[in-house]
């Protein structure tokens, strides 16, 4: 989804602004690695966020060394990657805003 791409760009800019180019690059690389792991093994993400928010099927794959994660659904023929959200964000509200 487009917002997931926007989230990646915005989070990368945030880390670059907060800690310089090297931190921005480390975040981007870690975020892409987490996303690729989901593409290879969709079940790797935790269903806990979906359970807590009462959103059936929602899974999250954490980004190593950063306080955020990819939120997605496993569909019959593809992955629906919804958002890349930072930990303190209200997940349910952000997903409602997407629709």
What are these regions (language model features)?
Residues 11, 41, 94-97:
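Residue-level signal for well-ordered alpha-helical positions
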Residues 26, 31-40:
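Generic amphipathic, hydrophobic interface segment in small proteins and small subunits
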Residues 36-63:
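A short, surface-exposed loop/turn module that caps and links secondary-structure elements
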Residues 63-99:
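Enriched for short, Lys/Arg-rich terminal
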């Amino acid at each position: 989804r487009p917002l997931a791409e926007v989230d990646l760009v915005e989070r990368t800019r945030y880390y670059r602004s907060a800690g310089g180019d090297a931190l921005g690059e480390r975040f981007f690389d870690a975020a892409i690695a987490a996303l690729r792991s989901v593409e290879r093994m969709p079940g790797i993400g935790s269903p806990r966020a979906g359970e807590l928010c009462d959103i059936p099927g929602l899974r999250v794959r954490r980004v190593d060394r950063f306080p955020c994660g990819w939120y997605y659904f496993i569909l019959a023929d593809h992955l629906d990657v919804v958002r890349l959200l930072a930990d303190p964000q209200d997940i349910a509200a952000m997903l409602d805003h997407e629709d």
